[in-house]
Amino acid sequence: MTFDPLSDMVSDHYEKWVYPDPIFDLPGWMANNWQWFDPRISHRMFWPDRDYVADIDILIAGCGTNQAAVFAYANPQASVVGIDISRSSLDHHDYLKSHYGLTNLELHQLPIEEVHSLNRDFDLIVSSGVLHHLADPLLGLQSLAASLRPDGVIGIMLYAKYGRVGVEMLQAVFRDLGLGQDQPSVEIVREVIAALPADHPVTSYLGIASDLHSDAGLVDTFLHRRDRSFTVDDCLDLVTGAGLVFQDWLLKSPYQHPLTSGSQFQTSMSELSQQQQWSVMERINARNACHFFTTCHENRPTQTYRIDFETDAFIDLIPEFRYRCELVDTQLLRHDWTLPLGGVALALVEQVDGERSISDIISRVSDDPSLAGENQSTLSDTSRNVFRSLWNLDFFAMRISNS
């Protein structure tokens, strides 16, 4: 029997339980919310060697109720194509397209596995929270890879295994109870969550999940008929299995260790491969419930996107504040936390303007009389450590200079 994604149980799910919550006020929503893969705010993580290009071709693969419209609204010169298996989700997209005059938005009821039928290729493909619901995630990613231009980027979000341990425990409970995707089952889910002990493994997830207020959000999280979670190794295996290469984590901080240089833990970690270090840290930073990462074709020149702090050429990198990041007095602010700075680290970050290279910044800081004790060699090593750390903590993106 031929598998038809449009008559699959996942398609039935999203026809009945429209998800995520429909947005009716796009500019109002965007005042305090954003899409991490939006090139308007994240292009530097996709293409570190070039500035934002307004008129790119974007595919939102599994656009849900709002995502393609958000991209089209935020990037008015881009051509945005949204595909989804849910007619209900696309109906709301049609409303947003008409209401906001999104002439740059094209919509299709189409499964990811059949994206080839568009006969199009794209600069940026975004599949956020979708591949982990497919019957065959590898086939889905292979299909997307076939529609990616040679220097294009695919942005992917997948469920992270260890941050969803509590979710998976409750999913198993609700399966044992014989719950379905109906209103009585949703009420039982609410009763169980309300009665959970404070130390239940799902508690940390409940604290960060923003969509559990709605019935559709509860169904999507706890009563989904098909989803799976991925480890770091699973993510990289999926990428290589699709004939692609792993470009980078879009959100890197969950995979970084917090201990200072010289600790025994860091010494032991340094003996591991990069992938092994990420794997260790996902089990330590176990609250992380989603992997956000980028991937690209194998033949894309690595010098156009690989950020390298290991060689002395790191001084040519140009640091830029990432979206919603800034320095206020001595506090480095991110959208979700604050890092106090002082001494040389503060002096270095104060010189970041999105135009100066690390080499330029070192030169300016070396002229600071208050840091007279820092010689050029020490300052270079400190700069490497400071900017590598703040890049890994998602405060900075790095531009690759073409000069």
Tell what function each PLM region has.
Residues 86-88:
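Conserved SAM/SAH-binding beta-strand->alpha-helix loop
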Residues 257-291, 295, 337-403:
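Long, charge-rich, low-complexity alpha-helical segments
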Residues 99-114:
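Conserved SAM-binding strand-loop segment of SAM-dependent methyltransferases
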Residues 138-151:
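A short glycine-rich, Lys/Arg-flanked "PGG" loop and its adjoining helix->strand segment in the class I
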Residues 153-205:
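Conserved class I S-adenosyl-L-methionine
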Residues 16-56, 70:
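Conserved alpha-helix/loop element of class I SAM-dependent methyltransferases that forms part
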Residues 64-77:
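Conserved SAM-binding loop of SAM-dependent methyltransferases across substrates and taxa
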Residues 113-125:
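A short acidic, Gly/Pro-enriched loop at the edge of an enzyme's catalytic core
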